A protein has these predicted regions:
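Short, conserved beta-strand element in jelly-roll/cupin
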Residues: 42-43, 52-68, 107-110
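A short beta-strand-loop-beta hairpin characteristic of the jelly-roll/cupin
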Residues: 58-80, 95, 117-119
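Conserved hydrophobic/aromatic beta-strand scaffold that supports enzyme active sites
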Residues: 30, 38-42, 58, 75, ...
Length: 135
């Protein structure tokens, strides 16, 4: 039998992410199709400037507040209920978390492989220090 759709309680899934993490982010992959991947993630600390080469990214803030920097624009506060979009190869960073927990629903088009994280300053991190996937 083929499954035509799946349903997710995003609010409840976000609550299952750990309170603390050794990585900058922790995520749950909800879908992982070639055309797009969808995740819920929590940001635990500042995230240095980085980019992804494989996908455009849509970020919908579920809870909390943070500063985000996209390309050369000044830092801007984002909060629950806001959607952010940027194209592949766009440098972005989260210099400060203003309110915890800071959780986000992310849609990457096309799919973003977990190792597609490139720090502007390579000393700032690796794909392994960037994110841990749960579930």
């Amino acid at each position: 039998m083929s499954v035509e759709g799946r349903f997710f309680n995003i609010t409840e899934l976000a609550k299952t992410l750990p309170e603390t993490a050794e990585t900058m982010l922790a995520d749950l992959r909800l879908t992982d199709e070639q055309a797009a991947s969808c995740r819920v993630f929590r940001v635990y600390r500042s995230v240095p400037a980085h980019y992804h080469t494989s996908c455009d990214e849509y970020l919908y803030v579920l809870t909390g507040r943070a500063e985000i920097v996209i390309a050369d624009a000044p830092a801007r506060e984002i909060r629950s209920g806001e959607l952010v979009f940027f194209k592949k190869n766009t440098v972005h960073a989260v210099p400060r978390i203003l309110e915890h927990p800071f959780t986000v629903l992310s849609v990457d088009t096309p799919r973003r492989p977990p190792d597609d994280v490139h720090f502007v300053n390579p000393a700032d991190g690796t794909p392994q220090s960037f994110i841990k996937t749960y579930g």
